[in-house]
C-alpha cells in the first residue's frame, strides 16, 4: 500500500474510535442525568432504576468497544 492510502487508513481509524468515544460519553451523560431525575422523582424505585441504569449503560458502552475492535482490526489486519 502506498503512503496516501495508509494515511487515510490511520485517519479513518482515528475518526472511528474518536466518534465512538464521544458518542458514548454523550449517551452515558444523558442516561445519568435521566437516572438522577428519576431517582429525584421516585426515591422508592432507586434499586429498580439503578439496575436498569447499569444494564442500559452496558449496552451504550458496548458500541464503542465494538468500534475500537473494528478500528484496531482495520489498522493491523489491512496492512
Curated annotation (Swiss-Prot):
Keyword Plastid belongs to the record: no
Entry keyword annotation includes Nucleotide-binding: no
GO cellular component, one term: proton-transporting two-sector ATPase complex, proton-transporting domain
Chain coiled-coil ranges: none
Disulfide bonds: none
Pfam families reported for this sequence: ATP-synt_C (PF00137)
SUPFAM superfamilies noted in UniProt: F1F0 ATP synthase subunit C
InterPro entries: ATP_synth_csu_bac/chlpt, ATP_synth_F0_csu, ATP_synth_F0_csu_DDCD_BS, ATP_synth_F0_csu_sf, ATPase_proteolipid_c-like_dom, F/V-ATP_Csub_sf
Membrane topology: Multi-pass membrane protein
An MF annotation (GO) of this entry: proton-transporting ATP synthase activity, rotational mechanism
Transmembrane segments: 11-31, 59-79
Domain of life: Bacteria
Residue(s) at site: Reversibly protonated during proton transport: 61
Subunit structure: F-type ATPases have 2 components, F(1) - the catalytic core - and F(0) - the membrane proton channel. F(1) has five subunits: alpha(3), beta(3), gamma(1), delta(1), epsilon(1). F(0) has three main subunits: a(1), b(2) and c(10-14). The alpha and beta chains form an alternating ring which encloses part of the gamma chain. F(1) is attached to F(0) by a central stalk formed by the gamma and epsilon chains, while a peripheral stalk is formed by the delta and b chains.
HAMAP family per UniProt: ATP_synth_c_bact (MF_01396)
Function: F(1)F(0) ATP synthase produces ATP from ADP in the presence of a proton or sodium gradient. F-type ATPases consist of two structural domains, F(1) containing the extramembraneous catalytic core and F(0) containing the membrane proton channel, linked together by a central stalk and a peripheral stalk. During catalysis, ATP synthesis in the catalytic domain of F(1) is coupled via a rotary mechanism of the central stalk subunits to proton translocation. Key component of the F(0) channel; it plays a direct role in translocation across the membrane. A homomeric c-ring of between 10-14 subunits forms the central stalk rotor element with the F(1) delta and epsilon subunits.
Family stated for the protein in its record: Belongs to the ATPase C chain family.
Protein name per Swiss-Prot or TrEMBL: ATP synthase subunit c
Amino acid at each position: 500500500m502506498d503512503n496516501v492510502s495508509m494515511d487515510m487508513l490511520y485517519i479513518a481509524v482515528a475518526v472511528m474510535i474518536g466518534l465512538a468515544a464521544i458518542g458514548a460519553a454523550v449517551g452515558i451523560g444523558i442516561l445519568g442525568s435521566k437516572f438522577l431525575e428519576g431517582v429525584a422523582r421516585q426515591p422508592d424505585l432507586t434499586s429498580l432504576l439503578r439496575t436498569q441504569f447499569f444494564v442500559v449503560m452496558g449496552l451504550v458502552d458496548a458500541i464503542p468497544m465494538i468500534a475500537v475492535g473494528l478500528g484496531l482490526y482495520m489498522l493491523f489486519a489491512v496492512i
